[in-house]
Swiss-Prot record:
Keywords: Metal-binding, Nucleus, Ribonucleoprotein, RNA-binding, Zinc, Zinc-finger
Gene Ontology molecular function terms on file: mRNA binding; pre-mRNA 5'-splice site binding; U1 snRNA binding; zinc ion binding
GO biological process terms held by the UniProt record: mRNA 5'-splice site recognition; spliceosomal snRNP assembly
Subcellular location: Nucleus
Database matches in HAMAP family: U1_C (MF_03153)
Gene3D superfamilies reported for this sequence: Classic Zinc Finger
Entry protein name: U1 small nuclear ribonucleoprotein C
InterPro entries named among the record's database cross-references: Matrin/U1-C_Znf_C2H2 (IPR000690), Matrin/U1-like-C_Znf_C2H2 (IPR003604), U1-CZ_Znf_C2H2 (IPR013085), U1_snRNP-C (IPR017340), Znf_C2H2_sf (IPR036236)
Broad class of the protein's primary localization: nucleus
Family: Belongs to the U1 small nuclear ribonucleoprotein C family.
Length: 142
């Protein structure tokens, strides 16, 4: 009669019948062995991941490679100058608005058409913060 071998417990059962296997698989020692097996397997997988990461990091460091996160990205502006805040470097910065107000293409109240753009000249010249009036323009009669 064939015997059943339990890999977790490293033992042969008396014989290969469903009732014997069911009794064995429900036992405390078998459950502990299964739990230890998978816990060890998870620890091994975690260690492999740590080793791979350390190896990849060391390889990049030794070759002097630039980290992939900086490739193709815009250069970082100098500290203290935030171009989104407007104004040249060294000028006091304006605080950002907490919520974007209605602007071109933003809908108004439900069922209302979108708000038109602000008055002419309120966008400001390039490089200047918004809401700064443009310098007066000369109009020629036609």
């Amino acid at each position: 009669m064939p015997k059943y071998y339990c890999d977790y417990c490293d033992t042969f059962l008396t014989h290969d019948s469903p009732s014997v296997r069911k009794t064995h698989n429900g036992g405390r020692k078998h459950k502990d062995n299964v739990r230890m097996f998978y816990q060890k397997w998870m620890e091994d997988q975690a260690q492999k991941l740590v080793d791979q990461t350390a190896r990849a990091f060391a390889t990049n460091r030794m070759q002097g490679a630039v980290p992939r996160t900086t490739m193709g990205m815009a250069p970082v502006p100098p500290v203290g100058h935030h171009p989104m805040m407007g104004g040249p470097p060294g000028m006091p910065m304006m605080a950002p608005r907490p919520f974007p107000g209605p602007g071109v293409g933003f809908p108004g109240a439900p069922g209302m058409p979108p708000f038109p753009g602000g008055p002419m000249g309120m966008a400001g010249p390039p490089g200047m913060p918004p809401m700064m009036p443009r310098p007066p323009q000369q109009f020629r009669p036609m």
